[in-house]
């Protein structure tokens, strides 16, 4: 689904990571682990093709990717249901009703997104992933603003996505109880040795 070879990325014109290598297939999840400022967001943005790599290559179809950033990116004047219907039409993707049920948004579906709490907006933002029809989810701290119950809803959506042959790459500090692999990113510096993902079941 995606393969990364000797990838280097930069932030503000300065190299932050180099020699990043991994491959990910359908049904697999990968979490990026490292201290704040190491370059996790920069790496995710590069993998999502939102910025060019400094070096190396990314193999895989960009049209397979759905990206969820720190910002929720919801349309505040549209209702919850209208937001999901909009994105479903844009991506020719899945059924908004399924996403609404998965993230427990039934009682909120007719409420404008601008009237939602921070946690509710985050649930709506993550529900969008389900209507894109994209196989590879790239997620930057997806559980921000979520309470414990909502984290479990998100974890369930990830499990369902993986079970259906999808894949996920994410930066998160929350244990989602999902078996996956971890890619350790070393201390901030311009050059890093090759980074190999290791099995660490239950971390995700």
From Swiss-Prot:
Keyword terms, alphabetized: ATP-binding, Cell inner membrane, Cell membrane, Cytochrome c-type biogenesis, Membrane, Nucleotide-binding, Translocase, Transport
Gene Ontology BP annotations: cytochrome complex assembly
Annotated compartments:
Cell inner membrane
List the SUPFAM superfamilies hit by this protein, alphabetically: P-loop containing nucleoside triphosphate hydrolases
- Single GO molecular-function term? ABC-type heme transporter activity
Q: What does this protein do?
A: Part of the ABC transporter complex CcmAB involved in the biogenesis of c-type cytochromes; once thought to export heme, this seems not to be the case, but its exact role is uncertain. Responsible for energy coupling to the transport system.
The entry sums up its family as follows:
Belongs to the ABC transporter superfamily. CcmA exporter (TC 3.A.1.107) family.
Q: What quaternary arrangement does the UniProt entry report?
A: The complex is composed of two ATP-binding proteins (CcmA) and two transmembrane proteins (CcmB).
Q: Please state what the protein is called.
A: Cytochrome c biogenesis ATP-binding export protein CcmA
